[in-house]
Amino acid sequence: MTTLIHVLGSDIPHHNQTVLRFFNDVLATELPEHQIRHFIVASHDGISPADFPALRIETCVDKKTLAEAVIARAKSNRKMRFFLHGQFNPTLWLALLSGKIKPEQVCWHVWGADLYEEANGLKYRLFYWLRRMAQKRIGHVFATRGDLAWYEQRAPRVPTSLLYFPTRMDPALTSMKVDKPLAGPMTILVGNSGDRTNRHQEALRAIHKQFGNNVRVIVPMGYPANNASYIAQVEKDGLALFGVKNFQLLKDQLAFDDYLNMLRTCDLGYFIFDRQQGIGTLCLLIQFGVPFVISRKNPFWQDLTEQSLPVLFYGDDLDEALVREAQRQLASVDKHQIAFFNPNYLQGWRDALALATGEPT
């Protein structure tokens, strides 16, 4: 029996908590302990074991400490297996590249950002080159359809499988009929967080050019922390374009139910990041019948079209009539069949964890 250790290698509380909750509340009820129980998590503030009684969680104060713990285990027992959830930890990449961790010991679920090279400068170019080499030294890679297509071009010999992030969704809401009011200004959601990859200011200018100032704009920027300067820049531009009445910037992270209620009020989402991210928010918008604009560089468009969902591309002509038509198309889709919705993504996780421990699927 192979024990699988799940690695959350960077201190990203929101995403890490989602994964831990999914394993504790869902997978632990049906899968064997050796597949789901053992976690190593980077968390400066720590994690309460009482919140996840079905799991055994070892916390490390930072990424480097976590990487050292994983490397020590990998070297002490070459039969030990690791499942990397996301992978924003340079020390682990270097350990794979140097052979301290063997390819056959590692499966990796891509979260998106680690595939893309957005920073500039000599230091980053060198690191990206090393990371590309390390990413070819993985036993098995799991990702969205679009990310797999990107990865397979660069590492064609590595086995891959489709797998979706376990978005927190209430399946009962998928059946809910949503009627969008046709009167009054449209409400547009810009971005899924305060991260600069959302390119908030560029999105606000594009919305103003397409729709004028007679739309309501909501910008959630509750995380990441220590982001006050960028938030102030976005707020200044948003108020100048749309005015106090039509521009709302959310500086605090909303409780989940409040976030859902906010999404229900939207007519359109606007997400122009040039990579796969924000799938959780995209799933919830689809559930509520809200179409969205995405960049052509975001490979998740391949997953959307595979599920026969309407796609609005950033840079194309857009007006209210096209938005309403996308809403109509979205309403006609059988959302219960969407592969990246709960509970449809569960089978992918069952298969992935069995594969990672060398068991038949």
Curated annotation (Swiss-Prot):
Catalysis: reaction(s): beta-D-ManNAcA-(1->4)-alpha-D-GlcNAc-di-trans,octa-cis-undecaprenyl diphosphate + dTDP-4-acetamido-4,6-dideoxy-alpha-D-galactose = alpha-D-FucNAc4-(1->4)-beta-D-ManNAcA-(1->4)-D-GlcNAc-undecaprenyl diphosphate + dTDP + H(+)
Keyword Manganese: no
InterPro entries in the cross-refs: WecF
Pathway terms, separated by semicolons: Bacterial outer membrane biogenesis; enterobacterial common antigen biosynthesis
Pfam families reported in the protein's UniProt record: Glyco_transf_56 (PF07429)
Location of the protein in the cell: Cell inner membrane
Claim: Magnesium is one of the keywords in the record: no
GO cellular component, one term: plasma membrane
GO MF terms held by the record: 4-acetamido-4,6-dideoxy-D-galactose transferase activity; fucosyltransferase activity
An individual GO BP term: fucosylation
Membrane topology: Peripheral membrane protein
Assigned keywords, A-Z: Cell inner membrane, Cell membrane, Glycosyltransferase, Membrane, Transferase
Family: Belongs to the glycosyltransferase 56 family.
Reported function: Catalyzes the synthesis of Und-PP-GlcNAc-ManNAcA-Fuc4NAc (Lipid III), the third lipid-linked intermediate involved in ECA synthesis.
HAMAP family xref list: WecF_RffT
Protein name: TDP-N-acetylfucosamine:lipid II N-acetylfucosaminyltransferase
Native organism: Pectobacterium atrosepticum (strain SCRI 1043 / ATCC BAA-672)
Gene: wecF
